[in-house]
Amino acid sequence: MKVRNSLSALKKVPGAQIVRRRGRTFVINKLNPRMKARQG
């Protein structure tokens, strides 16, 4: 899980999903599980 300032590059990756949990924005990817990130 990476912590990034901007998730715009990660959300363009195929299979990416934007999820809001506990007031934070996450990117999860079922096709490529290494592409996980949280903003802030």
Swiss-Prot record:
InterPro entries: Ribosomal_bL36, Ribosomal_bL36_sp, Ribosomal_L36_bact. One of its GO terms (biological process) is translation. The keyword tRNA-binding does not apply. GO terms for molecular function: structural constituent of ribosome. One of its GO terms (cellular component) is ribosome. Coiled coil: none annotated. The keyword Nucleus does not apply. Keywords: Ribonucleoprotein, Ribosomal protein. Belongs to the bacterial ribosomal protein bL36 family. NCBIfam families: PRK00831.1. HAMAP family: Ribosomal_bL36. This is Large ribosomal subunit protein bL36A. The gene is rpmJ1.
